[in-house]
């Protein structure tokens, strides 16, 4: 599954949880690797379902928001404690014709990108 996704997205690197350390440990490995890269990195879990043209779409968003942590996934059921806030932000975005919402924190680790200058803060 992970290898198929990596191939589909032409990923530069892949981090597999071969020792059952868990998602958090694997995100830490990926973020540590990202901290050593000169280019911005997108971290995506193997169960993500990227849209067609994801690489180009993601690049457009990262160009648009170079200094922001960008999440490319918004769940409609999890985490439950954020659903009301998400709904409120979506209503505001709809009224203002915005094509994005902002939150004060990352609430999903499915697919995200941290600006290179902030990766060490996340670690």
Spans of model-derived segments:
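An acidic/histidine-cluster motif and surrounding catalytic segment
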Residues: 1-44, 48-123
């Amino acid at each position: 599954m992970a290898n198929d996704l990596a191939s589909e997205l032409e990923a530069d690197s892949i981090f597999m949880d071969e020792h059952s350390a868990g998602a958090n440990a694997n995100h830490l490995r990926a973020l540590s690797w990202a901290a050593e890269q000169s280019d911005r990195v997108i971290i995506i879990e193997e169960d993500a379902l990227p849209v067609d043209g994801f690489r180009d779409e993601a690049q457009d968003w990262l160009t648009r928001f170079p200094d922001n942590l960008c999440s490319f996934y918004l769940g409609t059921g999890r985490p439950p404690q954020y659903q009301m806030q998400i709904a409120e932000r979506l209503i505001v975005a709809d009224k203002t014709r915005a094509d994005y919402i902002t939150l004060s924190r990352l609430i999903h680790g499915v697919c995200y990108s941290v600006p290179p200058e902030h990766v060490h803060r996340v670690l």
